[in-house]
Amino acid sequence: MLPQRVYAKIDLDAICRNIKNAMDKVGKETKVMAIIKTDAYGHGAVPVAKALSEIGCYAFGVATAKEAVVLRKSGIKNPILILGYVFPQDYDDLINYEIMHAVFEYHTAKALSDEAVKLGKTAKIHIKLDTGMGRIGMQPTDESIEEIKKIYSLPNIEINGIFTH
Protein backbone atom coordinates (compact mmCIF):
# COMPACT_ATOMS: atom_id res chain seq x y z
CA MET A 1 0.00 0.00 0.00
CA LEU A 2 1.32 3.44 -0.96
CA PRO A 3 1.34 6.16 1.69
CA GLN A 4 -1.13 9.03 1.34
CA ARG A 5 0.07 12.40 0.12
CA VAL A 6 0.44 15.01 2.82
CA TYR A 7 -2.11 17.81 2.93
CA ALA A 8 -3.02 20.60 5.31
CA LYS A 9 -6.56 21.47 6.29
CA ILE A 10 -6.79 25.16 7.13
CA ASP A 11 -9.41 25.75 9.81
CA LEU A 12 -10.02 29.51 9.93
CA ASP A 13 -12.44 29.05 12.83
CA ALA A 14 -9.67 27.40 14.88
CA ILE A 15 -7.19 30.15 13.96
CA CYS A 16 -9.71 32.82 14.97
CA ARG A 17 -10.57 31.01 18.20
CA ASN A 18 -6.88 30.80 19.15
CA ILE A 19 -6.22 34.48 18.41
CA LYS A 20 -9.43 35.51 20.20
CA ASN A 21 -8.30 33.56 23.27
CA ALA A 22 -4.97 35.40 23.20
CA MET A 23 -6.73 38.75 22.74
CA ASP A 24 -9.02 38.01 25.70
CA LYS A 25 -6.02 37.18 27.90
CA VAL A 26 -4.14 40.42 27.17
CA GLY A 27 -7.23 42.59 27.53
CA LYS A 28 -9.09 45.05 25.34
CA GLU A 29 -6.59 47.86 25.94
CA THR A 30 -3.79 45.84 24.28
CA LYS A 31 -3.53 45.92 20.49
CA VAL A 32 -2.68 42.54 18.95
CA MET A 33 -0.63 42.16 15.77
CA ALA A 34 -0.85 38.76 14.08
CA ILE A 35 2.30 37.76 12.21
CA ILE A 36 1.18 36.31 8.88
CA LYS A 37 4.43 36.41 6.91
CA THR A 38 5.18 33.91 4.15
CA ASP A 39 1.51 33.64 3.18
CA ALA A 40 0.51 33.09 6.82
CA TYR A 41 3.01 30.22 6.97
CA GLY A 42 1.28 28.59 4.02
CA HIS A 43 -2.23 29.01 5.41
CA GLY A 44 -3.22 31.85 3.06
CA ALA A 45 -2.45 35.38 4.25
CA VAL A 46 -5.46 37.04 2.65
CA PRO A 47 -8.18 34.74 4.07
CA VAL A 48 -6.41 34.61 7.45
CA ALA A 49 -6.09 38.41 7.59
CA LYS A 50 -9.74 38.90 6.59
CA ALA A 51 -10.93 36.43 9.24
CA LEU A 52 -8.72 37.90 11.98
CA SER A 53 -9.73 41.42 11.05
CA GLU A 54 -13.38 40.48 11.55
CA ILE A 55 -12.72 39.34 15.14
CA GLY A 56 -10.86 42.53 16.03
CA CYS A 57 -7.19 41.76 15.41
CA TYR A 58 -5.59 45.21 15.22
CA ALA A 59 -2.65 44.75 12.83
CA PHE A 60 -0.64 42.32 10.74
CA GLY A 61 3.09 41.69 10.38
CA VAL A 62 4.57 40.42 7.12
CA ALA A 63 8.07 39.74 5.79
CA THR A 64 8.15 41.71 2.54
CA ALA A 65 6.73 44.74 0.76
CA LYS A 66 5.12 42.43 -1.81
CA GLU A 67 3.21 40.57 0.92
CA ALA A 68 2.00 43.86 2.38
CA VAL A 69 0.83 45.23 -0.97
CA VAL A 70 -1.06 42.00 -1.70
CA LEU A 71 -2.95 42.45 1.59
CA ARG A 72 -3.78 46.09 0.79
CA LYS A 73 -4.93 45.25 -2.73
CA SER A 74 -7.12 42.51 -1.21
CA GLY A 75 -8.96 45.08 0.88
CA ILE A 76 -7.16 44.74 4.22
CA LYS A 77 -7.39 48.15 5.95
CA ASN A 78 -5.67 47.21 9.25
CA PRO A 79 -2.18 48.52 9.96
CA ILE A 80 0.51 46.35 8.33
CA LEU A 81 4.14 46.21 9.47
CA ILE A 82 6.93 44.81 7.31
CA LEU A 83 9.30 43.05 9.69
CA GLY A 84 12.21 42.63 7.28
CA TYR A 85 14.32 44.67 4.90
CA VAL A 86 12.58 46.73 2.23
CA PHE A 87 14.33 47.69 -1.00
CA PRO A 88 14.40 51.46 -1.66
CA GLN A 89 12.51 51.01 -4.93
CA ASP A 90 9.53 49.83 -2.82
CA TYR A 91 9.42 52.89 -0.53
CA ASP A 92 6.79 54.63 -2.65
CA ASP A 93 4.45 51.64 -2.27
CA LEU A 94 4.94 51.66 1.51
CA ILE A 95 4.08 55.32 1.70
CA ASN A 96 1.19 55.26 -0.78
CA TYR A 97 -0.41 52.16 0.77
CA GLU A 98 0.26 53.39 4.36
CA ILE A 99 2.33 50.34 5.24
CA MET A 100 4.66 50.54 8.24
CA HIS A 101 8.34 49.74 7.81
CA ALA A 102 10.72 48.34 10.43
CA VAL A 103 13.64 50.77 10.72
CA PHE A 104 16.88 49.88 12.45
CA GLU A 105 19.23 52.63 11.25
CA TYR A 106 19.10 56.35 10.55
CA HIS A 107 19.95 56.26 6.85
CA THR A 108 16.90 54.08 6.07
CA ALA A 109 14.63 56.50 7.93
CA LYS A 110 16.24 59.42 6.09
CA ALA A 111 15.63 57.77 2.70
CA LEU A 112 11.99 57.10 3.66
CA SER A 113 11.65 60.69 4.83
CA ASP A 114 13.02 61.99 1.53
CA GLU A 115 10.56 59.82 -0.45
CA ALA A 116 7.64 60.85 1.77
CA VAL A 117 8.49 64.54 1.34
CA LYS A 118 8.67 64.02 -2.43
CA LEU A 119 5.23 62.35 -2.41
CA GLY A 120 3.74 64.88 0.01
CA LYS A 121 2.79 62.09 2.42
CA THR A 122 3.93 60.56 5.71
CA ALA A 123 5.99 57.38 6.09
CA LYS A 124 4.96 55.25 9.07
CA ILE A 125 7.66 53.28 10.85
CA HIS A 126 8.42 51.10 13.84
CA ILE A 127 11.88 51.12 15.41
CA LYS A 128 13.36 47.63 15.48
CA LEU A 129 15.52 46.69 18.47
CA ASP A 130 17.99 43.82 18.77
CA THR A 131 17.40 42.53 22.29
CA GLY A 132 20.01 39.80 22.23
CA MET A 133 19.20 37.46 19.35
CA GLY A 134 21.92 38.95 17.15
CA ARG A 135 19.41 39.78 14.43
CA ILE A 136 19.06 43.13 12.76
CA GLY A 137 17.98 45.96 15.00
CA MET A 138 19.24 48.86 17.04
CA GLN A 139 21.16 47.98 20.16
CA PRO A 140 19.67 49.15 23.48
CA THR A 141 22.36 51.81 23.99
CA ASP A 142 22.64 55.56 24.53
CA GLU A 143 23.92 55.89 20.95
CA SER A 144 20.75 54.26 19.65
CA ILE A 145 18.62 56.64 21.70
CA GLU A 146 20.38 59.56 20.04
CA GLU A 147 19.84 57.98 16.62
CA ILE A 148 16.13 57.49 17.37
CA LYS A 149 15.90 61.16 18.37
CA LYS A 150 17.38 62.08 14.97
CA ILE A 151 14.85 59.82 13.25
CA TYR A 152 12.03 61.41 15.25
CA SER A 153 13.04 64.85 13.99
CA LEU A 154 12.90 63.86 10.30
CA PRO A 155 10.10 65.45 8.26
CA ASN A 156 7.19 63.28 7.13
CA ILE A 157 8.16 60.38 9.41
CA GLU A 158 5.72 59.01 11.98
CA ILE A 159 7.07 56.55 14.56
CA ASN A 160 4.20 54.21 15.45
CA GLY A 161 6.04 51.85 17.76
CA ILE A 162 9.13 49.98 18.88
CA PHE A 163 9.47 46.20 18.65
CA THR A 164 11.85 43.27 18.68
CA HIS A 165 11.65 40.14 16.55
Residue spans of the language-model regions?
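Active-site-proximal beta-alpha core segment in soluble small-molecule metabolic enzymes
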Residues: 2, 6-9, 30-165
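Positively charged, low-complexity intrinsically disordered leader regions
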Residues: 3-25
